[in-house]
């Protein structure tokens, strides 16, 4: 067996048998950051750097660690020089998931089985660009070739969803492309909060003067998304907080923030608690799956943030106090208010895996027969690795029902990232296969085949469509 062959990452014989059952399943990519405009316009890529390196802060972060100049990462260096800089980095990136992902992409998308190195970088650069043109590689072709059944984009709550509408009306591909409601700017600590209120008023024609009118305007946007095929929401919190407030306090917090005053951490916590609760009420009404990402400390390198903006590879894993206390109180309150929607929770700090999975298990009871209505999401961001995936599945299996897990998502800005689903499926097959080897489960390939098939595709489809 050699690196990156057909049995790549399949570490035992049962894994090979299980992988065959899931290798060709469709992909249900329920959370990503792809641009629906790019999907609709479907332009053929002219340069591999635009497709492979553009906007990919995972690669940028690794290149900086390898001493590559910013000019060759995000600057004005030629595309060939940027490609060579990436090759110099990748050839030394043993142990990093990018080494695996990148070579899977080269083999599975472009048919290139040799390893990318500094020595062959220029030749492969031209070979890849020729392939793009000869095979007319475009977003829709990549989506179709990867057998993607569903794409959930991530969208600003004030987006008019023009490109989603056009895709729904006039798209030659079978893939459903649905918006996801992402209202980060509705939370009072966001730097664009006041600008968001101004634009919210313009779009909804609701004058925001107090908490109730703000919620009314937000509700109008949630309904708009629901009318245009939205199946999910998403939010990113630095930490999970819970602090009750009176309506008068919430009005005071809003008015203070609107005139530029500081509201303090307590004000931030009270607003987060209240607005998220109201949003969850709306999400349940419309049947949205509510996704929560938490634990990221963002934009830590001030110089790069000011020069390049957000999402450029300078973010960290955070920590917090009272996670389980706050989360239990929050979920309990949502249950009491009959405002608990289906949810997927993603934590960035793996030290909280067991605590999160354990807490979610407290609130699975429902009369609708929903299986694991509160999901512990796949290893996110810095945990999107072999060990990260295994740690997440261990915690889920030990504290809940891994059989109900909705599985993998790309969470990516790249149309080449669908190979991450294959990577996950290989790791899943080995993970379950090892149970067979260790005699921890019966050697029942029919039943275990259904188990891995559900996690790879069918659970997600059911969770988002029923």
UniProtKB/Swiss-Prot annotation:
Question: Annotated pathway, please?
Answer: Carbohydrate metabolism; pentose and glucuronate interconversion
Q: Spell out the family assignment given in the record's similarity comment.
A: Belongs to the metallo-dependent hydrolases superfamily. Uronate isomerase family.
Which protein, by its recorded name, is this?
Answer: Uronate isomerase
Query: Top-level EC class, please?
Result: isomerase
Stated EC number for the protein is 5.3.1.12
Q: Name one Pfam family in it.
A: UxaC
Q: Which UniProt keywords apply?
A: Isomerase
List GO molecular-function terms, semicolon-separated.
Answer: glucuronate isomerase activity
- Some GO term, biological process aspect, for this entry: which one? D-glucuronate catabolic process
The reaction(s) this protein catalyses: D-glucuronate = D-fructuronate; aldehydo-D-galacturonate = keto-D-tagaturonate
Q: Does the keyword Disulfide bond apply?
A: no
């Amino acid at each position: 067996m050699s690196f990156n062959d057909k049995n790549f990452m399949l570490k035992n014989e049962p894994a090979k048998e299980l992988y065959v059952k899931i290798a060709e399943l469709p992909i249900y990519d329920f959370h990503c950051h792809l641009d629906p405009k790019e999907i609709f316009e479907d332009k053929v890529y002219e340069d591999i750097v635009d497709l492979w390196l553009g906007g990919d802060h995972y690669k940028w972060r690794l290149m900086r660690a390898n001493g590559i100049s910013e000019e060759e990462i995000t600057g004005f260096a030629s595309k060939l020089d940027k490609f060579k800089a990436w090759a110099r980095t990748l050839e030394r990136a043993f142990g990093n998931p990018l080494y695996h992902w990148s070579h899977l992409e080269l083999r599975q998308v472009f048919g290139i089985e040799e390893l990318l190195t500094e020595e062959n970088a220029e030749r492969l650069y031209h070979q890849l660009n020729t392939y793009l043109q000869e095979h007319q590689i475009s977003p829709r072709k990549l989506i179709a070739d990867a057998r993607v059944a569903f794409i959930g984009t991530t969208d600003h709550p004030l987006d008019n969803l023009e490109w989603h509408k056009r895709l729904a009306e006039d798209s030659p591909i079978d893939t459903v492309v649905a918006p996801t409601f992402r209202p980060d700017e509705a939370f009072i600590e966001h730097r664009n909060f006041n600008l968001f209120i101004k634009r919210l008023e313009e779009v909804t024609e609701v004058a925001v003067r107090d908490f109730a009118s703000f919620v009314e305007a937000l509700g109008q946007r949630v309904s708009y998304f629901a009318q245009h095929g939205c199946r999910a929401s998403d939010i990113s919190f630095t930490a999970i907080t819970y602090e009750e407030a009176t309506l008068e306090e919430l009005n005071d917090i809003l008015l203070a923030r609107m005139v530029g005053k500081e509201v303090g951490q307590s004000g931030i916590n009270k607003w987060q608690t209240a607005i998220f609760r109201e949003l969850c009420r709306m999400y349940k009404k419309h049947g949205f799956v509510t996704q929560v990402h938490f634990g990221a400390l963002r934009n830590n390198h001030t110089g790069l943030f000011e020069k390049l903006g957000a999402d450029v590879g300078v973010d960290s894993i955070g920590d917090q106090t009272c996670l389980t206390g706050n989360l239990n109180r929050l979920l309990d309150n949502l249950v009491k208010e009959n405002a608990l929607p289906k949810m997927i929770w993603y934590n960035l700090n793996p030290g909280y895996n067991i605590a999160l999975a354990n807490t979610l298990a407290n609130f699975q009871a429902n009369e609708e027969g929903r299986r694991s209505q509160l999901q512990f999401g796949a290893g996110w961001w810095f945990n999107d690795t072999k060990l990260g995936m295994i740690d997440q599945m261990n915690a889920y299996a030990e504290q809940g029902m891994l059989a109900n897990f909705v599985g993998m998502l790309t969470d990516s800005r790249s149309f080449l990232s669908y190979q991450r689903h294959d990577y996950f499926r290989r790791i899943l097959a080995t993970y379950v296969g090892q149970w067979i080897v260790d005699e921890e489960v019966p050697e029942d390939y029919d039943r275990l085949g259904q188990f891995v098939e559900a996690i790879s595709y069918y659970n997600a489809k059911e969770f988002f469509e029923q």
